[in-house]
Amino acid sequence: MRGSGNRLALRFWQLALLALLLVAWHALVVPGVLPTFYFDDPNKAAFFFGEPLKVGARVWQWFAGGEIYRHLWITLLETMLAFFIGTVFGVAVGIWLALAPAASALLDPYIKAVNAMPRVILAPIFFVWFGLGVGSKVALGVTLVFFIVFFNVYQGVREVSPVVLANARMLGASPRQLLRHVYLPSAMSWVFASLHNSVGLAFVGAVVGEYLGSSEGVGYLILQAEGVFDINTVVAGVVVLTAFALILDGIVSLVERRLMVWQPRSGETERI
């Protein structure tokens, strides 16, 4: 009961903070509510920062009229494909290189070089290879997700206790059994730690790709609004993307709790 009450109190204060931020935003852009401290024209604040009521009205108009569903579906499809493909390849390559020191040493400078490269500059190349459709956005998202997952899995496998490995080998564990019962459980916590960041990066890859070249998607809607200086629609697009990114992150957290039931929850180790 006490833990449930603490969670409710936390949610209350989180919502209260959100309400406070919205009120402050509204007060900042409504002419006459606050004295002008930067703009010579009191209407300029609304032009540059948007108005929360108009942003909410735009979001409502999108969903009530059905205009956004096709664009949102495209963006979510690109995001989920990039997230899934990047995660699968990141886990596979991370485990392989962690268990193959020779290959890891050989490929180490190349992996570091590609990781240091700003992946956004690859977007024009992907447009040439895959066109302006879903494929180029997925490819860009995969390059962002892959390295986050890869480095976490690589480190997680290498952090396996030598004592645990020695005990498993003494009990006659085969390489496949070691992978399933020792290496993978050790890497799982590292994998889920990376997935929370990967969700946002998958969205970044999809939206940036749409922004640079597309005819559909939420990034395309934001680009069109920017072209006519419609800041309210731009912010509305950001709000929609943020909301769905939080939903996907919540799904990852739910899966994590289901699969990592053996792991102590936050704060339990301190009580022990």
Predicted segments with their positions:
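N-terminal signal-anchor/first transmembrane alpha helix
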Residues: 1-32
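Periplasmic/extracellular loop-to-transmembrane helix junction in inner-membrane transport proteins
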Residues: 2-4, 31-84
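Membrane-spanning helices that line or support transport/gating and their immediate boundary helices
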Residues: 30, 34, 95, 102-109, ...
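Transmembrane-helix boundary motif in ABC transporter permease subunits
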Residues: 81-111
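Generic hydrophobic transmembrane alpha-helix motif, especially the helices
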Residues: 112-148, 155-156
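Transmembrane alpha-helices
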Residues: 139, 143, 175-209, 236, ...
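Short cytoplasmic-facing helical segments at TM-TM junctions of multi-pass membrane proteins
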Residues: 152-197, 218, 222
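C-terminal transmembrane helix and the adjacent membrane-cytosol boundary/short C-terminal tail
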Residues: 235-272
